[in-house]
Every structure is written in C-alpha cells, then in structure tokens.
Swiss-Prot record:
Region: Disordered, residue numbers: 1-51
Phenotype when the gene is knocked out: RNAi-mediated knockdown causes an increase in lifespan of about 60 percent compared to wild type but only when done at an early larval stage. Lifespan increase is associated with a decrease in the accumulation of the age pigment lipofuscin, a delayed age-onset nuclear membrane disintegration in muscles and loss of mobility. In addition, causes an increase in lipid catabolism resulting in fewer fat droplets in intestinal cells and hypodermis and lower triglycerides levels.
Residue ranges, compositional bias (Acidic residues): 20-41
Function: Negatively regulates lifespan and health span probably by participating in nutrient sensing.
Superkingdom of the source species: Eukaryota
GO molecular function: ATP binding; protein kinase activity
Transmembrane segments: 429-449, 456-476, 491-511
Keywords: Membrane, Transmembrane, Transmembrane helix
Name of the protein described by the UniProt record: Protein drl-1
Tissue expr: Expressed in vulval and body wall muscles, hypodermis, seam cells and tissues next to pharynx and anus.
Organism encoding this protein: Caenorhabditis elegans
Domain description: The protein kinase domain is predicted to be catalytically inactive.
Gene: drl-1
C-alpha cells in the first residue's frame, strides 16, 4: 500500500510550516554523538521552493515514507550545508537578501553602538513587523562607484548571507540607501565582544583556548567553502549568552577599512613583502590572525605592540614592510610572546606563527588537533574544581575584618599618617594653639577671597550698567548746558558718591555674611576637620598660662564615619566571597 502525495504550488511570500522528518533510528557512532551534542545557535531557514509536499488527510500515518521522499524532504528542509539539522524559519530572515524600501519603513533605529567618522557606523535596529533585533553596519563608500562595482559588492554580501554555522554570526541582508551608503544586517548579540573583556583584564588561559577553538571551527567552515574572513580581531568575536563565540563582520571587497591599524598588526609576513602586497586574503593569513587574537586575549595587547606604538597609518605600514623585508628582528614564538603560558598554548602558538605560509597549518588541522584537547581540558578543570572545593569557613568575629588588613602596605601607610597626625594634635603648648587658630583663619580667608571674587565679578557687571547710566546723565547735563547756556548748581560728584557708598557697604557686608555662613556650615559637617590644611582639634585641652585657649575633643566625640568607610571600601573586594560579610556590615553600620 502506498501513501498518495500531492505537490502544490506555494507563493514566495508564504510562511512555511515546520517540517519533522521521521527516520529509522540507528546507533550513532562516537563522532556523530559529539556532533549531535553541540547545539546550533542559529536557525537554518527554508529555501523558497516551487513545490512542497503535503499528505492527504486520509493517508495512514503509520506507513513509512520511501527513501526518495525522505531525500526530497531533506533537500527542502536543509538547503544550506549546516552542521545541524534545523528546519524552522527564523523570524530574522527576509524575503530577499536585498531589502526593499517597504521593509525599511518598518525598521526602527534603537541606538548607535559605535561610529567611525566618514567610514562606518554600527547601530541596533528592530524590525517592528516581527520585533526581531539586528546589528546594522552603515558604510560610507567613496563617490564614483560604477554599477559593476556596486553589483560585485552586492553579490559578495549575498554569498555571505547564505552561510550558516553555529560559530558564525549570520548575515540577513543589505540595503542600498544611496550609491555611497550601504546598510548590512547581521545578528544582534547584546553580550558584547572579546575586545570588551580584554579592555578590563586578560582572559584566563582555559577560556582563551576555548574561544580560539570556536574561532578555528568557524574558519574551517569558511575555508571549506572558499571564503576568507580577512578581518579577524578581538572586536569581531561576539560573545553569546552561553559564553560561546560568534565570528562576525568578514571582509567585503570594495568597502573601506574601519580599523586599519588593527588589521595591519594582525596581518601575516607575506602581506608585507612590498607595499602592494597588503591586504593578503588567504586562509593562511586567517590562521596568522588567530595567533594574534590569542596573544591579545592572554596579554591584552597584540604581538609586539610596544615596538609599533609610535607608528600609525602609512608609517606603520612602511615599518612593517621594512621589518619583514630587511631587519627580521622580531621573533614570533611562544617564548617571546607568552613565556608563562601552558604547554598546549605554546604548541598552538608555535604552530600558528610559521613564517612560511605553505607550512602553516590549516584551520581543519588545528581543529582536529586542539578541538578535542580543549574539551578534555575544560572537563578536567571542572572535575578538579569540584574535587578540590572546600567547605566555607565558619563566620569570624567582625574584629578580624580590620586585623587581617595589617599586612596590606597601603593600609600601613594610612595608619602611619593617622598616627603622625594624632601625635601632632596631642602636643600641648603655645605652638599648637597658634597652628590651630591660624589654620582656621586660613580657611576663613580662602572662603572670604572666594566670595570677594564672586561679588567682584557681579560688581563689575553692575559697574558696566551703572557706568552707562552715569554716562547718559553726563550727556544730558552737557546737553542742558549747551541748550540753555547755563550751568547747573547740583553737585554731580556728590550725587555719584551718595549712590556708590551704600553699594560698597552692602557688597562688603554680603561677602562677610556669606563667608561666615559657609564656614559654620563646613565646621558642622566636618569638612574643615578633614582638610589637610587645617590642624585637627587636639584630644586634650590647649592650656597657656592657666587659661584654656582651645577645648580638646575626646575619642568618643570623634565621628565613626572615617574608619567605617575605610573598612568597607578597602576590604570589600577581599571579603566579597566570605559568608560573614553581611553580618560584618550590619555590625559596623
């Protein structure tokens, strides 16, 4: 008995249903189990097809399909060569790689991620029809591109849009806004890049090896399909939520270089045989860039960055050509670049940094030799951390929160300065009395000068206005004298003096009052006592001739804010993992 099938014509704008292909279960081999255990981060889209098989409702479900039908369903469900079998249509996919104006009307600009002036701008967009997020790179091309050059760029992007791999950030399409403005859409990954991690600190060796294996896996897929990335650096390695790597932003011929300095420092020796040899777009050049990225992860800087620190642009290009053509002073090896690295990393670095591109290993060879090692090392480290894990220590008394910091050099210096200040404050006699009063007079004088300056500026503004008024009065008086041929008996100078004298008195009073109010406010808040120009109030009274000139401040009157702030701010990082932190903070507060 054979099941009947009918092939219907489906329009291009039809959303395809999910296809589930049932096959006979077979015992997979060990290699297939490892491949199936790795999940794909990117859904593989269905290719628009002219025909699509549907079963009749009355066909029995228990009858198995023939091999021919299964083969046809596989071709429809998985048109692109991907490592996983996923047949659902992603909401990020468009009808065509070249996005039209109707789709762009529904695109909402969320924000700018980064921008390089006159080169490109990277932004986040949301397609309101599906609420899918995209990272869009807006390129600014030079004027005068021919239609053939524009078509070549479009074909290159369309070829890249067809690539789907679990370690590649998928590209979904492009849009020509103008002949000099191109928008390229790819997957949006909000977790950041490896470059963001490197800006903070170096990446641990185990994590760096894991990231590099992911990069090599993506390169092996690209090189197998005759594609070269050409722009491999830490800023193009996207981090997923599961802490995996997605390789993004491959080189597209015809687009400008946004980061020429990074590209030059990550280029292989064969790119500098002459000034015209750059850029070198070969699979072996990608492998050399992998080594540069690995060194960047472990040291935070590209190889020999200190040697090229003062070179930029064309001068850096000429310096690299001179280095690889004549001098050959820099040795790219694990001993010179990362001498403290593990044996596995040293072997990987020495294999990658082979000056001869013919003897440089391919991405597939590196994946076969180091991919399994990376997984075994990760599993071994996880088991070791579980076996060596210790139970947390019981909570300690809060007094140990400060005792354990005695070995800290910075803490010792602070304590010495505090003891020195306390010894100076406890000295009695006439000199501490003079220092105590003179320091406060100094603070008051500074505040007074500050307010005088502020009021002086206001007075200058007022003087400009008053000068204009007086000048107008002067012109009026002269006009009256000329018109009437008479002299006025009013004292013009006396009139001006009567106006200016109250203004000067009021401004002086204002300066003194504001300075005193500010001084008392600073004394009450403790700001004066914290100033390094002010002598601290002594613990004992300052007595001269039997008279108490300065009243002392006992220990119990001192505010407890200073030691509390020191204890929390300096010891927070060292005590973050301890279980008694919450109890200690409550007790201090």
């Amino acid at each position: 008995m054979h099941s009947e099938e009918k092939y219907l014509h489906i329009p291009n704008n039809t959303k395809y249903p999910e296809i589930i292909v049932e096959e006979e279960e077979e015992d997979p081999s060990e290699e297939e189990r490892s491949e199936l255990s790795e999940t794909d981060d990117v859904a593989t889209p269905l290719r628009p097809s002219d025909t699509f098989p549907f079963k009749r409702r009355n066909s029995p479900c228990s009858i198995k399909m023939s091999e021919e039908h299964l083969k046809r369903l596989r071709e429809i469900a998985c048109p692109s060569p991907t490592p996983t079998q996923c047949s659902t249509v992603s909401k990020h996919e468009f009808q065509n790689w070249r996005i039209n104006e109707d789709v762009m009307k529904d695109m909402m600009h969320i924000g700018t991620i980064c921008e390089r002036e006159n080169v490109c701008k990277t932004s986040k967009y949301v397609y309101t029809a599906t609420m899918a997020s995209y990272t869009v790179t807006e390129w600014k091309l030079k004027e005068g591109n021919t239609p053939d050059e524009i078509e070549k760029i479009s074909r290159t992007i369309e070829d890249l849009c067809q690539l789907r791999h679990k370690r590649l950030a998928p590209m979904y399409g492009y849009h020509w806004r103008l002949e000099t403005e191109l928008m390229v859409f790819r997957a949006h990954v909000p977790s950041g890049t490896v470059a963001d991690l490197v800006k903070v600190s170096a990446i641990p060796q185990e994590t760096a090896v894991r990231y590099i294996v992911h990069v090599i896996d993506a390169l092996a897929y690209l090189h197998e399909r005759k594609h070269v990335h050409g722009k491999l650096n830490a800023s193009n390695l996207l981090l997923t939520i599961s802490n995996d790597i997605l390789l993004a932003d491959p080189f597209i011929e015809g687009l400008p270089s946004a980061q020429k300095r990074r590209a030059l420092l990550a280029s292989p020796p064969e790119a500098f045989r002459s000034l015209e040899s750059y850029p070198c777009l070969t699979p072996s050049s990608d492998i050399w860039s992998v080594g540069c990225v690995l060194v960047t992860m472990l040291t935070r800087y590209p190889p020999f960055l200190e040697h090229y620190m003062h070179f930029h642009g064309e001068s850096l290009h000429r310096e690299l050509v001179s280095e690889w053509c004549t001098r050959r002073q820099l040795i790219y090896s694990s001993q010179t670049l990362i001498p403290s690295a593990s044996k596995e990393i040293c072997e990987l670095i020495d294999q990658i940094f082979n000056v001869d591109p013919e003897n440089r290993p391919s991405a597939q060879n590196l994946l076969e030799s180091h991919g399994s090692k990376s997984r075994k090392a990760s599993l071994r480290n996880s088991l070791a951390s579980l076996t060596t894990a210790k139970e947390p220590d019981p909570p300690k008394p809060i007094d140990d929160f400060y005792v354990e910091r005695e070995d800290d050099e910075e803490h010792r210096k602070i304590e010495e300065l505090r003891e020195l200040a306390e010894r100076g404050n406890n000295e009695g006699g006439f000199i501490p009395f003079i220092r105590w009063y003179m320091s406060r007079i100094l603070i008051f004088s500074v505040l007074l000068v500050k307010w005088i300056g502020m009021v002086l500026c206001a007075a200058l503004s007022l003087a400009a206005v008053a000068g204009g008024v007086f000048f107008a009065i002067f012109l009026i008086y002269n006009g009256i004298q000329i018109a009437c041929q008479c002299s006025l008996n009013e004292g013009f100078v006396v009139l001006i003096a009567l106006i200016l004298l109250p203004i000067i008195i009021l401004l002086t009073t204002l300066c003194c009052n504001n300075s005193l109010d500010r001084y008392h406010a600073d004394v009450e808040s403790g700001k004066v006592e914290k100033s390094r120009f002010v002598m601290k109030t002594p613990e004992k009274d300052v007595i001269v001739g039997g008279y108490i000139l300065v009243e002392g401040s006992p220990d119990h009157d001192k505010p407890a804010e200073v030691p509390r702030k020191l204890g929390i701010s300096e010891g927070l990082q060292s005590t973050m993992g301890n279980t008694f932190l919450g109890y200690g903070v409550d007790k201090i507060a």
